[in-house]
Amino acid sequence: MMALLQTFNHKGIRQLKYREKIWQVVSRIPRGKVATYGQVASLAELPGYARYVGYTMKMLPRGSKLPWFRVVNAKGELSFPKHSAQYQTQQEKLEAEGVVFSEGRFCLRTYQWMID
């Protein structure tokens, strides 16, 4: 039983560290720029964890100030189902920062955050 508890605690601590790394990267994405899930994972030193980045964004507490909406997929699209409330919210927030959409997409080359 004690070994199981230690394993759980270790896994929980590791996941918290992963989330903190992801949050730090996302907090640095500038206004008017986006980063892909894979890019955030790589910058957080978690290569191959793109899906975990998505999960972490999904689990943000309501009212979080983290700019979750700046994290997008590698196709230059939003990952929410089109016409959903979440899709509309994300698109509106990005457009308010100057990201231009055309037919539900934007030019990733133009808006992708590149670290100097």
Predicted regions and their residues:
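Nucleic acid-binding interface residues in structured DNA/RNA-binding domains
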Residues: 4-116
